[in-house]
Amino acid sequence: MDARSRSRERNLYEEIIAGQRAERDRSYSGQVVIRGKGNPWVQDRQGLVRFYLFPSRYDGWRPVETALDGWIVFAQEVRRHSGKHRHQGGLVIYVLEGEGHSIVDGERLDWEAGDLLLLPIRPGGVEHQHFNKDPDRPVKWVAFINTAIYEWGASEMVQLERHPEFRERPRR
């Protein structure tokens, strides 16, 4: 192989360095305030949610404009109950309004506004579902997942029960 051919080969080491530099640069110049108005509420399998941060690698490597890329951050409203699913722990939920309970691996955990709910990291993940005590007044919370921890635990999302208001969209 001549020098000219080698110069056209992909240089993964240089791509790593460039990627790390881009991450660092974005941490200095990226968006640090994410406005709720720009993010719609969406009915998904777990309930009514509004995403604030979503990693680029989960969304087709779209360009990221925020200072952080390694987090999933979303708000959720729970009227009666959420869907039920299992995934690796490392999830942090801060309850803003209301009260209720969660069933986490068969154990009932009661919570109210101002509480922090932590889903532990366990082999095989954590099965959980959330319930509102007063269906006339929705529970509101914000949840945080650090994707490095989530992926380190080889997380797999397994939906066990869908939220009753979720409707599957036809595939195109």
Q: Where would I find each of the regions flagged by the language model?
A:
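A short, N-terminal "cap"/entry segment at the start of jelly-roll beta-barrel domains
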Residues: 1-68, 156-172
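Conserved short histidine dyad/triad with adjacent acidic residue
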Residues: 54-59, 71-87, 120-125
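Short, conserved beta-strand element in jelly-roll/cupin
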Residues: 73-78, 86-102, 144-147
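A short hydrophobic beta-strand segment most commonly corresponding to one strand
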Residues: 93-94, 118-119, 134-154
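Short acidic-glycine-tyrosine-enriched beta hairpin
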Residues: 94, 106-123
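Short loop/beta submotifs within extracellular cysteine-rich repeat domains
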Residues: 102-103, 152
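A generic structural motif
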Residues: 103, 131-133
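Short, Lys/Arg- and Gly-enriched loop/turn segments at beta-strand edges
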Residues: 125-131
